[in-house]
Amino acid sequence: MTDWTALIRDVPDYPKPGILFKDITPLLADHAAFTQVVDELGDGLTFDKVVGIEARGFILAAPVAYRSGAGFVPVRKKGKLPADTYEASYDLEYGSATIEVHADAFDPGDRVLIVDDVLATGGTARAAVELVRRTGAEVVAASFLMELSFLSGRDRLPGLDVRTLLTV
């Protein structure tokens, strides 16, 4: 595995004071690094569909699905999908948020890989796992570009194969 930390820019006080934002756009702009990340996120796994969590998860999940010959399924913020959906809510630092997936996005027994850019508190990932399972599909793993280990998000995903390419 390659260390891509030099291609991830720290942006202090974004989007609000006290937050150190991890900007992955320099990594995405580097063809070799982006290709390696896409290859490694799904490496060694067998799956039928790849879930990408809005918004940066889309950037990573769609090429993983393409490279693997799998389908891509977007998990979006509430109100952004046009057909019947399942929804799951999760807590944020102040308040809560809701994500949705189309009710017909998976066939029962589909093997699903969840992909996102960052594993932080684990709330969003846990809600995505709940959505997939509600459809009758099986989550085989969740893969993230980076994990903010000090937030212990992995602890909110017990029994799940959690993979991260970088830990900060």
Regions inferred by a protein language model and the residue ranges of each:
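PRPP-associated nucleotide enzymes
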Residues: 1-168
